[in-house]
Amino acid sequence: MVNDSIFIKKGVELEIEVQSLAYGGMGLAKVDDFVVFVKNGIPGQRVLVLIYKKKKGFAEARIIKVLKQSPLATKARCDHYWICSKLQTLSYEEQLKEKEKQVVDAFQRIGGFTDFTINAVRSAENKFNYRNKMEFTFSPHRWILESEPEGVDSSFALGLHIPGRYDKILDIDTWHIQPDIGNKILGIAREVCLKNLDLKPYDPKTNIGFLRHLMLRFGVKTNQLMVNIVTAYDDINKLSPLIDTLLKEVPEITSMVNNVNTRKADVAFGEFENLIFGNSFIEEKIGNLKFEISANSFFQTNTYQGKVLYDEVLKIADLNGDEIVYDLYCGTGSIALYLASKAKEVYGFEVIRSSLENAEKNSLINKIDNVHFLKANLDTFFKSGQLPRRIPKPNVIVVDPPRAGMHPDMSGYLHKLKAEKVIYVSCNPTTQARDVKILNDNDYKIKNSVMVDMFPHTPHIETVMLLSK
C-alpha cells in the first residue's frame, strides 16, 4: 500500500478504504490528507483502485477489486445502476445520511455556518418506479460491456448515454427507476426496430439515420401515458410499424406524438411536432392541482416527492391569507399555484416565455385568479427598477433558481424587497450555501431547513430553507 500522496499518479494502483460519499455520488477516500474520489465506491468498502486522473488537490480512481465489502452495501435492482442511479448499492437509510452530511458540509465549508444542521429529512415512500419522464436514445453505436460475449451486434442500441461518453449508448431493456410499463414499451420498440430495416437509428456524427429518441411521460396520478418518438426528419409512413405495434400492444397509451429534430444538436425536442394519437398532452395531479404536460414542457420529474416538496414550502411559509408572495424563477408556476389558496396574491417571475405560457394555462385549468405571471430576467429585473409600481411589495419570497443559483446581483438585491420571509428551494447545496451566506450578511437568518429526497438512489439533493429577519 502506498502511504504518501507524492506517489499518487495516473496508472498507480492503491489499496484504500472509502470513508464517505462526496457531493455528486463518488466515494471519498484519503491517502494521508490527499483526497481520492472513487467511482462507484461506497462508505466502508476496502478496495483496490486504479488512478485514472490526477489533479493538484485530488485524484480520481476506479475500482479494480473489492477487497472487503461494506456492511452498508445492498444489491442493486438495476443491472446498469451506475449510469444514473449509482447509489443503489448503498442502503437507502445510509443514502439519506450521506446526503444530509453533504448539505451540512456545504453550509459549514462554503457558507461559514459552523452550527448548521438539517431540521428534518423527508424520505421517499416510492423508492423505485418514481420517474414520470424518461428520455432514451437510439444509436448505431452500442456500448459493449466487458461481461458480454464477443461478436455482439453493436449496430443498434436503445438506452442511455454512458457517463462521460456521448458517442455510444448502453442498450437497456429494464430500468426500475421508471414505471414498469416503460420497460414494456422499451422492449416492444427495440423488437420492432430490429425487424424493420427502415427504422435506422440516427448517427449524429454522419447525420444519417431516422430514429433519435424515445421519450416517455407518465401521469402517475391520472394513469395517462405519452410516447414521443423523436426523428431526424418528417416521415410518418416510415414510423407506421412502430406506431401501429405500440398502440396495439400498449393500450395504456393515451397520447402519441412525433417531434421532428432536423438539427445536429442531440436533443429530445424538435422544430415541430406531429400529433399521432390522442391529445398532445397528458394530465397530472399534485395535491388538488391539475397540470397539462406536453412533450417538451417542464414538470417535476417525481410526482410523489413533488407533493412532499410543495407541502414543505407551504408549511414553512405559514400563510394566513393576507400575504403578497413572490415566486422567483417560477418556471411553469407549480409552486405559485400551490400557494395561491393560502395567499392574498402571488406573483411569479420567469424569463422563459414557453414556461410562462404553461403557467398561465395551468392557472386557467385550475381556475386560480390570484396568481399573476411576469416575464423577467431576474439577473437584472429588480436591480434595474423594472418591477411595475402597481405590484405591491412582498411579505414572502420563494426562490427556486437553477443549479447555478442566483445571479450575484439578485442575491445581493433581494433584501431590498424587505420581505419578512425568504424560502429558498434548491437542487444544489453548494450554490445555495453561497447565496444564503449573502442573504445572511443582509440580516436574513436561517430558521428552518428541510431535505427532501426527490430522487432515491441518485446523488441529487433538494433542500427547502426558511430565512427571516
Region roles according to the model:
Residues 3-17, 23, 234-469:
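Rossmann-like S-adenosyl-L-methionine
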Residues 128-132, 223, 459-460:
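A short, glycine/Asx- and small/polar-enriched loop/turn
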Residues 64-75, 82-200:
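Extended interfacial segments that mediate partner engagement and assembly in macromolecular machines
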Residues 27-32, 158-162, 228-230:
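Short, acidic/hydrophobic/Gly-rich beta-strand patch recurrent on exposed beta strands
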Residues 217-219:
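Structural signature of eukaryotic scaffold interfaces centered on beta-propeller domains
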Residues 1-80, 372-373:
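Terminal RNA-binding accessory module
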Residues 167-210, 233-257:
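Internal alpha/beta scaffold segment
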